[in-house]
UniProtKB/Swiss-Prot annotation:
Family in the record: Belongs to the CobT family.
UniProt catalytic activity: 5,6-dimethylbenzimidazole + nicotinate beta-D-ribonucleotide = alpha-ribazole 5'-phosphate + nicotinate + H(+)
CDD domains referenced in this protein's UniProt entry, alphabetically: DMB-PRT_CobT
Name of the protein in its database record: Nicotinate-nucleotide--dimethylbenzimidazole phosphoribosyltransferase
One BP term from GO: cobalamin biosynthetic process
High-level lineage: Bacteria, Pseudomonadati, Pseudomonadota, Gammaproteobacteria, Pseudomonadales
GO molecular function, one term: nicotinate-nucleotide-dimethylbenzimidazole phosphoribosyltransferase activity
Keyword list, A-Z: Cobalamin biosynthesis, Glycosyltransferase, Transferase
Record-annotated active site: E317 (proton acceptor)
Amino acid sequence: MTQAWWRDACQPLDNAAMDQARARQQQLTKPAGSLGQLEALAIQLAGLQGLERPTLDQVAITIFAGDHGVVEEGISAYPQAVTGQMLRNFVGGGAAISVLARQLQASLDVVDLGTIDAQLELPGVRHLRLGTGTANFARQPAMTENQLQAALQAGRDSAQRAAEQGAQLFIGGEMGIGNTTAAAALASVLLGCPASELSGPGTGLDNAGVQHKAEVIERALRLHGLRAEDPLQALACVGGFEIAALAGAYLGCAQAGVTVLVDGFICSVAALVAVRLNPQCRAWLLFAHQGAEPGHKTLLAALQAEPLLALGLRLGEGSGAALAVPLLRLACALHGQMATFAEAAVADRPA
């Protein structure tokens, strides 16, 4: 790789703001620690925003889409045409994330990195066309070096757009038939875990389908001879355009000082790639939920992440992260708007 912008320094957290927020928490009209994880979230957001009283009014959601050549191996319950059809649904307002974005008053950006329909042209979609999906990684590398660079940069560009628009929180979502297979393959390399422990039903495979999926991944990993110490090679060989873009977006956000709320299994794999490329970015990543894919719990543990929700979700699209936004907003509201003991004339210690 000739360009290594992802190694550039990430923004530091504001320790003074965190100290001020921590001190404020001790003065609010409640027993210390009684709001549990919400208190820690408010303090963390204070450090990320550099404000004693953080807010999350401006939320930017970007969906990255791309098709996967490995679908040729019969690893998905749905045909590849669904990826392009869902792009229409996103901008048409009918997808789950479209509804959630409206309810949250969040911006929604849709980026097509490369679907099988090279002629697809939809108003409201950024068509980058890095290829008609990735190559079948069971037989050859998924991406060329140029495609990988372009996908990472596409994510970085999305992060920069969000920062320029004043976003206080960035959510990346994904759409791509076959992408749980790519994510499981990447996680298998980076975590050193058997594919059988990380492969799940995705969009609805039965047990035999999940077993076949794991076998396809194991065969591909033997073909490519990948090492955990080289996450970029792993990303190029068995990843996806949208997974690379997510990793680029997370790194770009950390460098620009925009907090990231990571969605489910696929997004967590992208987060792991980002952290392996630049460990400084980890401080900027919050994790929304633990999903239904069996490998997600292992991933979260590797990232030392405490997810906010556990609802059995496996939709993707950034939907789980969007569902966690009200929780973060309420954490900020409680922190910023509750009275202190002095303001409320309430005794600050037991009798």
